């Protein structure tokens, strides 16, 4: 049985903190056990090439991305970001993408 379920009644265990120690507690039978890991939830963010447009506004706000003076073909603004997406496809991984800081237009 997984450590996410109560060993006594098989109900789901919920995180509970006491004295800076993480426990997993059952709300049904009050069984408590110390958590094996301090990690409660993991969210892996691995966007695909087609979804870059969905998070373009977040990319513009990222101060770690390098900026470049380049004219946008969509609105003519002269500041953009450039980055190399991490993807499984070799041809995408070798491309450099530019993103307009004003209209969020994306081009290679």
From Swiss-Prot:
DNA-dependent RNA polymerase catalyzes the transcription of DNA into RNA using the four ribonucleoside triphosphates as substrates. Component of RNA polymerase II which synthesizes mRNA precursors and many functional non-coding RNAs. Pol II is the central component of the basal RNA polymerase II transcription machinery. It is composed of mobile elements that move relative to each other. RPB9 is part of the upper jaw surrounding the central large cleft and thought to grab the incoming DNA template. Involved in the regulation of transcription elongation. This is DNA-directed RNA polymerase II subunit RPB9. A zinc finger (C4-type) spans 6-29. It comes from the Eukaryota. InterPro entries: DNA-dir_RNA_pol-M_15_CS, Rpa12/Rpb9/Rpc10/TFS, Zn_ribbon_RPB9, Znf_TFIIS. GO terms for molecular function: DNA-directed RNA polymerase activity; nucleic acid binding; zinc ion binding. Its main location: nucleus. It comes from Encephalitozoon cuniculi (strain GB-M1) (Microsporidian parasite). The keyword RNA-binding does not apply. A zinc finger (TFIIS-type) spans 68-108. It is found in: Nucleus, Nucleolus. SMART domains: RPOL9. The gene is RPB9. Keywords: DNA-directed RNA polymerase, Metal-binding, Nucleus, Transcription, Zinc, Zinc-finger. Belongs to the archaeal RpoM/eukaryotic RPA12/RPB9/RPC11 RNA polymerase family. Component of the RNA polymerase II (Pol II) complex consisting of 12 subunits. Zn(2+) 1 binds at residues 6, 9, 26, 29. Zn(2+) 2 binds at residues 72, 75, 100, 103. The keyword DNA damage does not apply.
């Amino acid at each position: 049985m997984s450590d996410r379920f109560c060993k006594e009644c098989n109900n789901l265990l919920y995180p509970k903190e006491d004295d800076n120690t993480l426990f997993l507690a059952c709300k049904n039978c009050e069984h408590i056990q110390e958590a094996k890991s301090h990690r409660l939830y993991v969210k892996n963010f691995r966007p695909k090439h087609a979804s870059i447009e969905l998070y373009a506004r977040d990319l513009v706000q990222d101060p770690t991305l390098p900026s470049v003076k380049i004219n946008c073909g969509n609105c003519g603004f002269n500041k953009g970001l450039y980055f190399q997406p991490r993807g499984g496809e070799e041809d995408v991984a070798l491309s450099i993408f530019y993103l307009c800081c004003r209209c969020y237009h994306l081009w290679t």
